[in-house]
Swiss-Prot record:
Pfam families: Dynamitin. Residues 1-26, 183-203 are annotated as: Disordered. PANTHER family: DYNACTIN SUBUNIT. Subunit of dynactin, a multiprotein complex part of a tripartite complex with dynein and a adapter, such as BICDL1, BICD2 or HOOK3. The dynactin complex is built around ACTR1A/ACTB filament and consists of an actin-related filament composed of a shoulder domain, a pointed end and a barbed end. Its length is defined by its flexible shoulder domain. The soulder is composed of 2 DCTN1 subunits, 4 DCTN2 and 2 DCTN3. This is Dynactin subunit 2-A. It comes from Xenopus laevis (African clawed frog). InterPro entries: Dynamitin. It comes from the Eukaryota. GO terms for cellular component: centrosome; cytoplasm; dynactin complex; dynein complex; membrane; microtubule; vesicle. It is found in: Cytoplasm, Cytoskeleton, Microtubule organizing center, Centrosome; Membrane; Cytoplasm, Cytoskeleton. Keywords: Coiled coil, Cytoplasm, Cytoskeleton, Dynein, Membrane, Microtubule. Belongs to the dynactin subunit 2 family. Part of the dynactin complex that activates the molecular motor dynein for ultra-processive transport along microtubules. In the dynactin soulder domain, binds the ACTR1A filament and acts as a molecular ruler to determine the length. Modulates cytoplasmic dynein binding to an organelle, and plays a role in prometaphase chromosome alignment and spindle organization during mitosis. Involved in anchoring microtubules to centrosomes. The keyword Cytoplasm applies.
Length: 403
C-alpha cells in the first residue's frame, strides 16, 4: 500500500501506469554528426557490378589445404591464403616455380604472343610512321626473343623433362631425332673393326629422317619481310616527296600516290621538253594565248552587260519606293493607333471579367444571407413560442402558489 504522506501532493497522476524517466545526455553526447560525402577528385569511387563479379568468379574454388588462421604462440608463422603470378606448377598449392617450370612457362607465353601477333598482322593495317611499336617491329622482337630463349640451351642444363610437346613441337621433334641418332650409334660396330661385307646394304643401321615443314611459319616470315619493305618504301616516299607549290607550274601534278607514280610523271614531263617537240608546244601555246585574249574580251562585255542590268533593276526599285514612301508614315500612325485600341479593348475585357466575377460573388453572398435570415427567423419563432409556454407555466404555478 502506498505511503499516505504522498497522497495529497500536487502533480501526481492517479489511476495511471508509472513512468520512470532519466535525465538527458550531456550536450557533447547529444551532437549528431552527419557523414559528409567525399567529392574530392583525389578519391577514386569504384563501382562494382555484382553480375560481372559473379560471372568472373563463377565455378571458382578456394584451396583450403594447409591453411591455418588460428592465433600463434610460437615463432613459426601460420599459412593463410597465398596468391601469385601465373605459374605452371605441379600438384599442390604454395609451391615455388622450379627452373624447368619457369622455362616451360616462358616457352608457352612466347608461343601465345607469336600467335597473337600473327592475328594482329592479318587483321590490322600497317600503322603510321609516327607509331613507336608497329606489328612488324613487334613480330621481329618476338622472333628475336624466341631465338634468344632457344639459344640458351636450357634443355641440356635442366634435363630431358624441360621440353613441352604441346607448346613447342619443334623442340619435341629435335629431341626425338637426337634420340634416334643415339640409338643408331649404339648399334654400330666397335672402333677398329670393319663391318662385315654382305651382298646388300645393312638395313638395321639405316636411319630414316622425317622432315616436317611449317608453311604458316614461312608465310609469317614472308609477310614480316614484305611489311618491313613496305614500311621502308613509305619512309622513303615521305622523305623524297615535297609539298606541292601552287605558284610553280613545274611542280603541278607531281604529288603522286607513290614514288613510282611520281617518277613516271617526271619522266613524261622530261620527254615533253625535247627539242623536237618544243616548236609544236610553242605553236599550241600561241593559239591558246589568242583564244584566251578573245575569251577575256567576251568576258568583259558580258560583265558590263550584267552590271548595267543590275543598275536598271536598282533604279526601278528606287522609283517604286518613291511612290510608297509618302504613304508609309500614315500606315505607321494607323498601326500605332490600332495597337492602342487593341490594348484598351483588352483592358476593358479584363474589367468586364472582373465585374462579372464580383457580381457572381455578391449574388452568392446574398443567397447565403437570405438562407441564414430564414433560419434565424424560424429559430426566433420557435424560441418565442417556447418562452410563451414557459411564461404561461410560470403564471399557472404562481396562481397555484397564491391560492
Amino acid at each position: 500500500m502506498a505511503d499516505p504522506k504522498y497522497a495529497d501532493l500536487p502533480g501526481i497522476a492517479r489511476n495511471e501506469p508509472d513512468v520512470y524517466e532519466t535525465s538527458d545526455l550531456p550536450e557533447d553526447d547529444q551532437a549528431e554528426f552527419d557523414a559528409e560525402e567525399l567529392t574530392s577528385t583525389s578519391v577514386e569511387h569504384i563501382i562494382v557490378n555484382p553480375n560481372a563479379a559473379y560471372d568472373k568468379f563463377k565455378d571458382k574454388k578456394v584451396g583450403t589445404r594447409s591453411l591455418d588462421f588460428s592465433d600463434r604462440i610460437t615463432k613459426s608463422k601460420r599459412t593463410g591464403y597465398e596468391s601469385g603470378e601465373y605459374e605452371i606448377l605441379g600438384e599442390g598449392i604454395g609451391m615455388k616455380e622450379t627452373p624447368q617450370q619457369k622455362y616451360q612457362r616462358l616457352l608457352h607465353e612466347v608461343q601465345e604472343l607469336t600467335q597473337e601477333v600473327e592475328k594482329t598482322q592479318s587483321t590490322v593495317k600497317e600503322s603510321a610512321a609516327e607509331e613507336k611499336l608497329t606489328p612488324v617491329a613487334l613480330a621481329k622482337q618476338v622472333a628475336s626473343l624466341k631465338q634468344q630463349l632457344v639459344s640458351t640451351h636450357l634443355e641440356k642444363l635442366l634435363g630431358p623433362d624441360a621440353a613441352i610437346n604441346l607448346t613447342d613441337p619443334d623442340g619435341a621433334l629435335a629431341k626425338r631425332l637426337l634420340t634416334q641418332l643415339d640409338a643408331a650409334k649404339t648399334r654400330k660396330n666397335p672402333e677398329g673393326k670393319s663391318p662385315a661385307k654382305g651382298p646388300g646394304p645393312d638395313t638395321e643401321n639405316l636411319v630414316t629422317y622425317e622432315l616436317h615443314c611449317r608453311p604458316e611459319q614461312n608465310k609469317f616470315s614472308q609477310a614480316a619481310k614484305m611489311a618491313e619493305l613496305e614500311k621502308r618504301l613509305g619512309e622513303l616516299e615521305v622523305a623524297v616527296r615535297c609539298d606541292q607549290d601552287t605558284q610553280n607550274p613545274l611542280t603541278v601534278g607531281l604529288q603522286g600516290s607513290c614514288l613510282m607514280d611520281t617518277v613516271e610523271i617526271l619522266q613524261a614531263k622530261v620527254n615533253l621538253l625535247d627539242v623536237a617537240s618544243l616548236d609544236q608546244v610553242e605553236a599550241r601555246l600561241q593559239s591558246v594565248l589568242g583564244k584566251m585574249n578573245e575569251i577575256a574580251k567576251h568576258k568583259a562585255a558580258i560583265e558590263d552587260a550584267d552590271t548595267e542590268s543590275k543598275v536598271h533593276q536598282l533604279y526601278e526599285t528606287v522609283q517604286k519606293w518613291d511612290s510608297m514612301s509618302g504613304t508609309l508614315p500614315q500606315v505607321v500612325q494607323r498601326l500605332l493607333t490600332l495597337k492602342q485600341l487593341h490594348e484598351q479593348a483588352m483592358q476593358f475585357g479584363q474589367l468586364l471579367t472582373h465585374l462579372d466575377t464580383t457580381q457572381q460573388m455578391i449574388a452568392n453572398s446574398l443567397k447565403d444571407n437570405t438562407n441564414a435570415l430564414a433560419m434565424v427567423q424560424k429559430a426566433m419563432k420557435e424560441n418565442l413560442a417556447t418562452v410563451e409556454d414557459n411564461f404561461s407555466n410560470i403564471d399557472g404555478r404562481i396562481k397555484k402558489l397564491s391560492k
